[in-house]
């Protein structure tokens, strides 16, 4: 009885009623069964929250995934997902259902992220006025449905990446927003690993859509990818 009461209070505090909760959960397919062979591998998924497809956030995440893959090429699989390719309605996080006949892409994305072979998730966003993009926020808000599914992202390793127009342009604030959402999912949040080892990957875009000249920023990107992979492998091995 106590657990049901606590859950009801949480949903009320989040602005989600019983009917709205059912609307959210009804859009999510059941988690697929995982094969024994798939369980031996660890998948790292990077999510680009930029509305500009294939630009600097995607490029930075690609570098992070390459660094993750290099940790153990035989066991690590990687995938980049760009939210710019998807239809996501952030209003559903507040329990506002889609119009009759409408669909969006979150249910398929939720199934992919919650799969047992996914050991790590890196979320990246450009910096917009010291915070993440509305697209990235809508995605993280929609992940409330995964929290409601017995914390489907729990114990997956999370990393955050931010690309700003100047060196100190709000990257760390953006990282903190992404990391806060991950912690609410019971994810294991890591930052960029040594030797930089601060709060995550912080990248500077000089305005020419070229981040390759940002040596320090790209080092944090590589360290983040490596660290996410290292911890995900340890988690998979039960260490």
Show the residue positions of the predicted features.
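Short, glycine-/small-residue-rich phosphate/pyrophosphate-handling segment
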Residues: 152-195
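N-terminal beta1-alpha1-beta2 submodule of the flavodoxin-like/Rossmannoid cofactor-binding fold
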Residues: 3-6, 11-149, 198-239
């Amino acid at each position: 009885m106590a657990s049901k009461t606590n859950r009801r209070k949480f949903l009320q505090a989040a602005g989600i009623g019983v009917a709205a909760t059912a609307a959210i959960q009804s859009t999510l397919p059941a988690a697929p069964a995982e094969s024994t062979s798939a369980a031996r591998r660890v998948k790292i998924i990077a999510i680009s929250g930029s509305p500009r497809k294939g630009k600097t956030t995607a490029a930075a995440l690609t570098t992070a995934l390459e660094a993750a893959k290099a940790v153990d090429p035989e066991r690590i699989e990687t995938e980049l997902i760009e939210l710019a390719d998807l239809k996501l309605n952030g209003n559903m996080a507040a329990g506002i259902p889609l119009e009759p006949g409408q669909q969006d892409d979150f249910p398929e994305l939720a199934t992919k992220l919650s799969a047992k072979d996914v050991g790590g998730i890196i979320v990246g966003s450009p910096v917009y006025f010291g915070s993440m993009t509305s697209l990235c926020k809508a995605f993280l808000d929609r992940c409330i449905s995964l929290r409601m599914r017995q914390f489907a992202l729990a114990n997956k390793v999370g990393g955050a990446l931010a690309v700003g127009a100047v060196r100190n342009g709000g990257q760390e604030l953006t990282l903190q927003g992404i990391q806060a959402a991950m912690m609410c999912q019971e994810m294991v949040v890591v930052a960029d690993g040594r030797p930089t080892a601060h709060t995550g990957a912080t990248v500077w875009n000089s305005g020419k859509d070229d981040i390759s000249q940002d040596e320090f920023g790209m080092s944090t990107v590589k360290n983040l990818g490596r660290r996410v992979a290292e911890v995900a492998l340890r988690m998979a091995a039960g260490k």
